[in-house]
């Protein structure tokens, strides 16, 4: 397991119901009622009995179609929504129990947020936009300028400090949004479809940039998208939502290899699994291969040439120089040739 230790966010049986008397309604709700049953009763189940943990340093991607409950769930994590049932802990504190003052402190000091609409202040320069949250914190001009310049450099916008938002491309504006939320050094970073307003090429560039940033900063991230490819590229784990519930929460490898519901399987149908599945996941422990090992972090696609040309049935797999098992070449070839 890559992520150990206590979770940063821990959600247990969380419900968020919209309607006239959600708390009263939830009390009378029979187990097993579907989203449509609840709607027939005049309520909307924005979040339906969700339990999940987000580990420190993990990037959890929440994926689902429009209306599946992604934003509502994330709003519950920061208590922008009061939940109807269940509990949410952030850094070991039950956020439902925090006073308004403590909640504001928590949001201000620990949580960063980036949204699809960049939300920049049009009459402020890049520098002043990025420094804005620091100004809100009462930092002096010199300190906030220094920090703002640091994060502007980090997101690749050095030299554009004095530009106004309208003078920047969409991708650059989103970089300003990212820099602004990084300025306060949040422990937990919520990103709600941050790249969906960008055209496909820029979007890909931003994803790469984002992975580079994350490798450097190691933040705990909850990232919302409705784009499965984006989820597969970025996520340590993906939570797939439907009708307010989490259908499956797993690594990209597991989601494409072992979808647990028909709904998740449908999402994975079109995916080129060879691009997602890693040798480390195919390695069977205790099975001994022969010869030169392949790297656990390599995808099946990256190993394509070797898999086709090699004659070994079992190929050893090594993680950080240690052999962890061996993969069945035929099985990997099946993934490559989409036969699995
Ligand atoms: N304030 C609200 N009042 C009533 N219903 C709401 C409210 N906010 C969200 N909902 C409903 O809750 C459900 C989940 O909405 P949510 O915005 O979380 O979905 P989403 O997956 O984030 O969608 P999108 O990708 O379109 O942003 C939807 O049926 C929505 O209509």
Curated annotation (Swiss-Prot):
What reaction gets catalysed by this protein?
a quaternary ammonium(out) + ATP + H2O = a quaternary ammonium(in) + ADP + phosphate + H(+)
Annotated transmembrane regions: none
Q: What role is this protein assigned? A: Part of the ABC transporter complex TmoXWV involved in trimethylamine N-oxide (TMAO) import. Responsible for energy coupling to the transport system. Is specific for TMAO and essential for TMAO metabolism.
The ABC transporter domain sits at: 32-268
Q: What protein does this entry describe?
A: Trimethylamine N-oxide transport system ATP-binding protein TmoW
Effect of gene knockout: The double mutant tmoXW shows significant reduced growth on TMAO as a sole nitrogen source. Growth on trimethylamine (TMA), glycine betaine (GBT), choline and carnitine is unaffected.
- Record EC number: 7.6.2.9
Gene from which the chain derives? tmoW
């Amino acid at each position: 397991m890559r992520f150990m230790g206590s979770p940063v966010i821990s959600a247990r049986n969380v419900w968020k119901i919209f309607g006239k008397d959600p708390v009263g309604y939830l009390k009378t709700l029979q187990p097993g009622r579907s989203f449509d049953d609840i709607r027939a009763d005049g309520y909307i189940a924005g979040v339906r009995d969700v339990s999940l943990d987000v580990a420190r340093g993990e990037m959890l991607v929440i994926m689902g179609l429009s209306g599946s409950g992604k934003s509502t769930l994330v709003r519950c994590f920061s208590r922008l929504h009061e939940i109807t049932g269940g509990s949410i802990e952030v850094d070991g504190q039950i956020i439902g129990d925090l006073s308004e003052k403590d909640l504001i402190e928590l949001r201000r000091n620990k949580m960063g947020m980036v949204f699809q609409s960049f939300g920049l202040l049009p009459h402020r320069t890049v520098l002043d936009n990025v420094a804005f949250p620091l100004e809100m914190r009462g930092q002096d001009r010199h300190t906030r300028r220094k920090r703002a310049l640091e994060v502007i450099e980090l997101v690749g916008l050095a030299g554009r400090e004095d530009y106004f938002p309208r003078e920047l491309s969409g991708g650059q504006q989103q970089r300003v949004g990212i820099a602004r939320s990084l300025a306060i050094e949040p422990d937990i970073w919520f990103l709600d479809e941050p790249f969906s307003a960008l055209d496909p090429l820029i979007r890909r560039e931003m994803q790469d940039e984002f992975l580079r940033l994350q490798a450097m900063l190691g933040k705990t991230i909850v990232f919302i998208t409705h784009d499965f490819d984006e989820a597969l590229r970025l996520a340590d784990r993906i939570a797939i939502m439907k009708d307010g519930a989490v259908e499956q929460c797993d690594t990209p490898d597991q989601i494409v290899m072992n979808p647990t519901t028909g709904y998740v399987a449908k999402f994975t149908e079109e995916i080129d699994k060879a691009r997602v599945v890693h040798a480390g996941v195919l390695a069977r422990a205790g099975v001994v291969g022969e010869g030169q090992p392949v790297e656990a972090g390599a995808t099946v696609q990256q190993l394509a040439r070797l898999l086709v040309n090699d004659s070994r049935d079992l190929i050893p797999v090594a993680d950080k120089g240690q052999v962890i098992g061996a993969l069945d070449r035929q099985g990997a070839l099946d993934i490559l040739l989409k036969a699995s």
